[in-house]
Amino acid sequence: FSEVRRNESSPFTYHKTLNYGECILEKRRAAARGLDEVVFLNGRGEICEGAVSNVFFVRKGEIFTPKLSCGLLPGIMRGYVMECCDVEERKIFPDSLGEFEECFVTNSLMGIMPVSRLGAYEFAKRDTIRRLQEKYRTICGGVLFP
């Protein structure tokens, strides 16, 4: 997790702006530690989003994602997943990650990507993620993700 916190009370948090400084710095720090992505918490300690992605969790086939009010940018792929699946928006704290079997991130360039580890928690299961990826590939006609 990033040590930088998202400001859930700032209106700029919810819009794409040209200020990617925090995301760039945190993504570089993560890469230096051998990580692909970093996840931000807000001032209340709730999980928000990745530096370049939205984050989802799966428990017993049910999909969960942080609420917009946690301080995240509502990405295009997040919207796609929310539209095609029954997704519950809720507050998610790092200490509750053990209740989930799967985790994935989304963005328009990488699509739907599984997360193997977030902090101390490992996510080995991929059933729901594979179904989502296949559905997305079908919609895209294999153009984006052969």
Language model features by range: what are they?
Residues 1-146:
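Helix-start/capping segments and mature chain N-termini
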